[in-house]
Each structure stands twice: as C-alpha cells, then as structure tokens.
A protein has these predicted regions:
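A cross-kingdom feature that marks ATP-driven nucleic-acid transaction machinery
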Residues: 1, 204, 210-362
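Conserved nucleotide-binding/hydrolysis micro-motifs of P-loop NTPases
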Residues: 4-5, 58-63, 81-85, 240, ...
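Conserved nucleotide-sensing/catalytic segment adjacent to the nucleotide-binding pocket
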Residues: 4-52
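Structural recognition of the conserved hydrophobic beta-strand(s) that form the central parallel beta-sheet
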Residues: 26, 52-58, 78
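Helical "lid/switch" subdomain of P-loop NTPase nucleotide-binding domains
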Residues: 29-32, 36, 59-60, 70, ...
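A short alpha->loop->secondary-structure connector
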Residues: 44-51, 69-77
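Short regulatory helix/loop adjacent to the ATP-binding pocket of P-loop NTPases
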Residues: 61-76, 89-92
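Interdomain hinge/linker elements that couple catalytic modules in large macromolecular machines
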Residues: 92-251, 255-262, 266-269, 280
Length: 362
C-alpha cells in the first residue's frame, strides 16, 4: 500500500472506489491507511456477505477512539511462520485433533529427519521467502531483518524513536533466554538498561509481532497447586533467536542445552499453528512445571517437550505430567503428551502419548 499512489488518491477523493474489485480484496499494510478499517466495516454491513476483505499488516496499529472494534464483522488472525508440518519436515502421521478427541494409540516409527536435521530446520526457520535458501543465506536474511527491526520497524507503529543498539541487544538477550521465564529485572541487568526501558521496548516488539509472550496457565479447577504467573517469551520463529546469537547448526549441535530451548520454542510455535489455540505454560510453587498447556475439543492438554527420546527422558517426563495433573480435580481427564525430537510416536504404558514433532499434524 505504501507504493500504491492510485489508492492514496481514491481514499482521499472517492474512498468507496478503493473497496471495489474481486473478492476477497487484500489490503497489505493496511495500518498505514487506518481509515480503511471503518470503510471496510461499513461495506461489510452493506454487503452482508462473508470473505470480502483481508487486511494484513506487520504491526498492530495504535488504538483510536474513532475506530470501531469490528466485533461480529472482522475476525483477527495472527499469522505465523511455517510449522514443521507445513514445511514438509513432518510426515503428518499423528493428528493432534484425533489424538485429543479419541485418545486412540497412534504409532509411527518413520524417520523423517533426525535430531541433526531438526536442528538444521530450526536454524533455517519457517519463513516462506527463505524456503529455498541455504541455512547460511536464511540466517543472513534474518540478521538483516533484525537490523531493520532495530532501526526502522520498531519505530514505525507509533513514531517513537528508540535506540537501535539497545533494541538489538534486547533481541539478543531474549534469544539467549528463549522459552524461559526471564524477568524484566534480569533482562535489564543483562543489557544494561532501566526496567522501564525494557518494558517499553518489549511492548513495542510485541506490537510488531517479533516477541510473543507464552502466558502462565490459570486454572479454574480445585487444586492443591499454587500456580506461578510469570510468562515465558519467544521470538516470532526459533530461527530468529538462532540468528540473533549467530548459532549455526554446527554450533547448536555443540550446545544441546540451547538447542533444547529452541526446540521447546519450536514445539510451542507448532502447537499454536496446528491447534489454532493459545498455548500457555504452567509451574507451581514447588517448581513442578509443564511446558505447554492448551484447550482442544473441550479437553485440557498438558505437554512436556524434550529434544531427546531416551527411556530415562520419557519416564521422567511421563511421571512429571502425571504428578502435575494429579494436583487438580478433573471432570474430564486431561490429555498428557510428550513431544520429542526422536523418531518414534507411541502410547506409553502409563497412558501418556509420546509424539515426535516430525510426525505431528493438525
């Protein structure tokens, strides 16, 4: 839209003309012409038909009193980068929806990609435009993207000028702590900034969809657990975290602890894509935690995320899931699942589902 001079003229003279054309009519970066929102809303009321317009944008626009919420007319959808399933790195053998609805055993032993392949895919990322690039080229693109975010994008949504060096340093700090409960204070100490500055910069990065908070799960059930409330934070794609700290696949193979953090972030990302739901995490006061929690088909799903798939890892994760679930009183029993970077998907004798990320589908 920023290059469509004809649209500028239409909006300033005959705005209704801009809405004419084949449907669905797409307005990219619509937030640069915020008057489109109310124009589209009124046109939807007039046409009384679904699927008329798609408004896309790389930033969330600032709220305006004059802009109607669009309730009942405009649905909001957060776009994400490709999941493993969408990029062809999962064979789709295990349907998440079927597993939750039926709890039927779904086994698969096909090796789609091994752990080294998973790490390479995480370092490459799920951006469609980078799909045919090498890992090195994709990471170089992402580092350039981070630079653009720090110098341009973070200021575009509200016109507030921010220090690009601090923005870049903040993104690197978030990358190092991806999928963990980093406090504002610890981030401020890490990058040498005031807490207020960190909070404001984080809000700006969320507004342009670079940072996403994984909020703590809050249960309405009777429970013996006192749940913590701190969020975890993720970048838009785990590859962005890898690129921010110059973590090539070879470096990640030599630092499996950080690779495990990226894998947790990848699984949280993919669960959100495949389920269409908001993904939470949970930790109680004793330190017992579950990496991902979401609701699907009327059931609560608890997920532990493990890059490895040794018997010891599976037994410990299954025990942890059962212990956490037992702290609540359930009307409908929860689904317990371990998502791994291994090549086996099966039902554990305890009833816990073990699923490879490379087998997972919607």
């Amino acid at each position: 839209m920023d290059t469509d001079l004809n649209l500028d003229m239409q909006l300033s003279t005959i705005p209704d003309l801009a809405l004419e054309g084949d449907t669905p009519r797409v307005f990219d970066e619509w937030q640069e012409k915020p008057q489109l929102w109310n124009l589209v809303r009124h046109e939807i009321d007039r046409r009384q038909a679904p699927g008329q317009f798609i408004l896309t944008g790389a930033t969330a626009p600032m709220e305006e009193q004059s802009r109607h919420s669009g309730a009942g007319r405009i649905a909001r959808l957060r776009m994400k980068t490709f999941s493993f399933y969408e990029s062809g790195h999962s064979n789709g053998a295990v349907s998440l929806a079927e597993l939750v609805a039926q709890e039927s055993p779904q086994s698969n032993g096909e090796t789609v990609v091994d752990v080294a392949g998973i790490i390479e895919r995480m370092a490459h990322g799920g951006w469609p435009a980078n799909r045919n690039y090498s890992v090195e080229a994709a990471q170089e693109n992402l580092r350039s993207y981070i630079d653009t975010v720090a110098h341009v994008d973070i200021n575009a949504a509200d016109g507030v000028r921010r220090d690009p060096v601090k923005v870049t340093t903040l993104i690197r700090s978030l990358a190092r702590g991806v999928a963990t409960e980093q406090s504002i204070s610890s981030i401020a100490t890490d990058i040498g900034a005031q807490r207020a500055t960190v909070s404001e910069y984080l809000a700006a990065l969320q507004r342009i969809f670079i940072v996403e908070e994984q909020l703590a799960w809050s249960s309405h059930l009777r429970s013996r657990a006192s749940l913590r409330t701190a969020p975890k934070r993720h970048l838009a794609d785990p590859a962005l975290a890898a690129a921010a700290v110059d973590a090539s696949p070879d470096k990640l193979l030599r630092n499996l602890a950080f690779a495990g953090q990226l894998f947790e972030s990848q699984v949280v990302h993919d669960l959100a894509v495949l389920s269409g739901k908001r993904i939470f995490h949970a930790r109680d006061a004793s330190g017992l935690e579950v990496d991902a929690v979401f609701e699907l088909a009327g059931r609560t799903v608890f997920v532990e995320i493990k890059l490895g798939q040794s018997q010891e890892i599976i037994e410990k994760a299954a025990s942890n899931l059962q212990a956490f679930a037992e702290r609540f009183e359930w009307e409908v029993t929860p689904v317990l699942m371990i998502v791994t970077g291994g090549n086996l998907s099966f039902r554990h004798p305890s009833g816990v589902h073990v699923v490879s990320l490379t087998h997972l589908a919607p």
